[in-house]
Amino acid sequence: MSSESTPDDVQRRIDELVKNNRVVLFMKGTAQFPMCGFSGRAVQVLKACGVEDLKTFNVLEDEAVRQGIKEYANWPTIPQLYIKGEFIGGSDIMMEMYDSGELQQALAG
């Protein structure tokens, strides 16, 4: 039996992470040490919103998830934010939503 994950296994793992955590950010690096500017900006926006229950997933440590997350939401870039199981978007969308107050509303509800 191979230890390789099938694409279906990867999608199930992603689905569990998204559904079992209120706020999930798939990013490059960690909240403490982001490995790209976009991921760093995403973490800062969430901190500015007062998010304390942020679950991050470092896609650089898992190539299968790094590719699989792009298929999961049909979104080509990382970071990707999910709130209450719903795909929100990447760092640009997060910034726009933050500036308009929509992100704070989504996180508060």
Regions found by a protein language model. Name each.
Residues 1-15:
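Flexible, polar/low-complexity N-terminal or interdomain linker segments that lie immediately upstream
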Residues 15-53:
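Local sequence-structure signature of Cys/Sec-based thiol-disulfide redox active-site neighborhoods
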Residues 51-66:
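Thiol-based oxidoreductase modules, predominantly thioredoxin-like and allied folds used
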Residues 71-77:
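Thiol/disulfide oxidoreductase modules built on the thioredoxin-like
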Residues 83-109:
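Non-catalytic, surface beta->alpha helical segment in thiol-disulfide oxidoreductase systems
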